[in-house]
């Protein structure tokens, strides 16, 4: 096998591979000899089938396997001898002349083919110890705990029927049956019986609750509303619906009491324990936001410290994924690029930059993780899978089988776990300076940072444990 490099431009490489006819013949003969003792053909004793006969019967199919094995060997040889890492699967280009291929399959001519590769960039990791990051931290105020307790008390207070003939007011609860229709046809999910609706909670479609103000028990009303353009169920978005509503009861809220009895409804023994649990929960929310902010700052710092060529196809794939999200978001909201104060051309330029950032950060984090020998234990992946299954009640077995049979899907579960471990590792190398801030300041930049959630690397899948993750695809 003769391998010659014919192109080296950036991360694109091409090699010409030549398999001599004599080598093809030798490989075929070896395969046929091995087949002789295994095959059973009518009219021949086991192990006594002439090789020439085997060649007439199986020669072409075995030669196809010989060629495929040779292609795989050539790919491996190219990668090992040139110390290359693939960004994508190699592209193999066989001769266009079918007669030439036919001769090679008969071992009467050399087989020449091209191997085109897109490879990973090589770069050195920089010293991260000179990075200084500010970590904003916020404390839970007593007023926030009190407000949370008030909400919990209001959500758990009892309701009692108003006097006969009483009209429903804001804050009351109405018990209703309803049937919804679009263009005169009942639609899925548009009907319910004995549904509790707290007037003023804004939990139903905008305008629905307002049309029940003043209603009395036993009254029937027709409610007409229009589903928002961004309604999750696309088949309903923007459509007008008419609901036939029967008001079965009008109930007034009881007093919202914050005491030990409230704590017991949440499985805690006292109000003090409930306050402690609420404070812990609110603190966890603030800690998570603080983590997001410092992680964003770290990724910004890493992005500014690394500059290397990016695999064009990986960037294109990442851009396509991000752009699809952007277009779907605009469509669901009924908006255009002009509505967002930009043009499609400008937006594409910005999101292409974001795609490049994601690929770059994915590659950097992958190399950091590889150099630090960071692994994700199977137990953690299993926990992530269990959490995923809980999102599909009633379909757990179906989703479980999908993940277990789909290595790519499992890699997507593992990738963010790997990234968080790598981020923790790098945060241990940098200098962190804590800065006390208010809760409002902690969340102030949330909207900008979320842009399309594409400014971070997690969805780029940085991990050295699978090819997909390594490529940050």
Curated annotation (Swiss-Prot):
Q: Name one Pfam family in it.
A: FKBP_C
Q: What class of enzyme is it?
A: isomerase
From the UniProt entry, list the residue stretches annotated as the region Disordered: 441-473
Xref: InterPro entries: PPIase_dom_sf, PPIase_FKBP_dom, Trig_fac, Trigger_fac_C, Trigger_fac_C_sf, Trigger_fac_ribosome-bd_bac, Trigger_fac_ribosome-bd_sf, Trigger_fact/SurA_dom_sf
Which key words tag this protein in UniProt? Answer: Cell cycle, Cell division, Chaperone, Cytoplasm, Isomerase, Rotamase
Record field: catalytic activity = [protein]-peptidylproline (omega=180) = [protein]-peptidylproline (omega=0)
Source organism superkingdom: Bacteria
Among NCBIfam families, the record links this protein to: tig (TIGR00115)
Q: What is this protein called?
A: Trigger factor
């Amino acid at each position: 096998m003769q391998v010659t490099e014919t192109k080296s431009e950036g991360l694109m490489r091409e090699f010409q591979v030549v398999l001599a006819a004599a080598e093809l013949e030798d490989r075929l003969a070896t395969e046929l000899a091995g087949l002789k003792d295994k095959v059973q053909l009518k009219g021949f004793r086991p192990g006594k089938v002439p090789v020439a006969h085997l060649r007439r019967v199986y020669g072409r199919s075995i030669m196809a396997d010989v060629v495929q094995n040779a292609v795989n060997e050539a790919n491996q040889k190219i990668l090992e001898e040139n110390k290359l890492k693939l960004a994508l699967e190699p592209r193999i280009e066989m001769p266009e002349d079918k007669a030439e291929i036919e001769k090679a399959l008969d071992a009467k001519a050399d087989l020449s083919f091209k191997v085109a590769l897109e490879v990973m960039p090589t770069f050195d990791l920089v010293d991260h110890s000179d990075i200084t990051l500010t970590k904003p931290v916020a404390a839970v105020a007593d007023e926030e705990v009190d407000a949370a307790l008030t909400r919990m008390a209001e959500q758990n207070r009892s309701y009692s029927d108003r006097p006969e003939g009483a009209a429903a007011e804001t804050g009351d609860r109405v018990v209703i049956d309803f049937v919804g229709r679009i263009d005169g046809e009942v639609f899925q999910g548009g009907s319910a019986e004995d549904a509790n609706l707290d007037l003023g909670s804004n939990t139903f479609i905008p305008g629905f609750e307002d049309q029940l103000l003043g209603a009395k028990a036993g009254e029937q009303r027709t409610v007409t509303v229009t589903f928002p353009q961004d309604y999750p169920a696309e088949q309903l978005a923007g459509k007008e619906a008419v609901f036939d509503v029967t008001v079965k009861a009008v109930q007034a809220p009881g007093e919202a009491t914050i005491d030990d009895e409230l704590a017991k409804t949440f499985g805690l023994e006292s109000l003090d324990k409930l306050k402690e649990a609420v404070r812990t929960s609110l603190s966890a929310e603030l800690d998570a936001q603080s983590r997001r902010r410092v992680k964003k700052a770290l990724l910004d710092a890493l992005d500014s410290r690394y500059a290397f060529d990016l695999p064009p196809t990986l960037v294109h794939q990442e851009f396509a994924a991000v752009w699809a999200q952007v277009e779907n978001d605009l469509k669901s909201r009924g908006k255009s690029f002009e509505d967002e104060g930009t043009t499609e051309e400008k937006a594409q330029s910005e999101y292409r930059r974001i795609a490049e950032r994601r690929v770059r950060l994915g590659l950097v984090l992958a190399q950091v993780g590889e150099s630090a020998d960071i692994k994700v234990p199977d137990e953690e992946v299993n926990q992530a899978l269990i959490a995923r299954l809980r999102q599909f009640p009633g379909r757990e077995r179906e989703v479980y089988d999908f993940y277990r049979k789909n290595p790519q899907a499992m890699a997507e579960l593992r990738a963010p776990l790997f990234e968080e471990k790598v981020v923790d590792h790098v945060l241990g190398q940098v200098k962190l300076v804590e800065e006390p801030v208010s809760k409002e300041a902690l969340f102030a930049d949330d909207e900008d940072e979320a842009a399309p959630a594409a400014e971070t690397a997690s969805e780029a899948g940085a991990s050295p444990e699978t090819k997909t993750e390594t490529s940050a695809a």
